[in-house]
């Protein structure tokens, strides 16, 4: 899965396009081309005049589910459809991260491992 920005005037467009270009030329350890699943970026999410790093790729996979952040924007439904097509053996659950993203992270960030001290 790779994030893609369709709005050419968006500040992320160029970098994400370059990422896609690099990945498109990449192969796995067996010399096979990678299967690339494009995930559109959500429309910009702005809180208190600050654009926050909303991304659907901040998802979490568990044994039976996939928790996907959503942001109450037009792209949410399309992205959930893509996830459901890809993760056919897991329940895809949308989690509203509209407020959570203000902390500059979402589901995947919250579930990171804590090292034992």
Give, region by region, the residue ranges found by the protein language model:
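Histidine/cysteine-enriched polar flanking segments
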Residues: 1-117
């Amino acid at each position: 899965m790779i994030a893609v920005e369709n709005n050419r005037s968006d500040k992320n467009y160029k970098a994400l396009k370059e990422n896609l270009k690099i990945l498109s030329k990449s192969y796995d350890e067996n010399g096979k081309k990678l299967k690339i699943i494009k995930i559109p970026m959500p429309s910009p999410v702005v809180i208190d005049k600050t654009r926050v790093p909303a991304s659907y790729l901040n998802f979490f996979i568990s044994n039976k589910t996939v928790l996907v952040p959503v942001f109450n924007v037009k792209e949410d439904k399309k992205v959930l459809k893509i996830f459901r097509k890809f993760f056919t053996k897991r329940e895809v659950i949308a989690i509203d991260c509209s407020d959570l993203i203000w902390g500059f992270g979402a589901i995947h960030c919250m579930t990171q491992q804590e090292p034992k001290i």
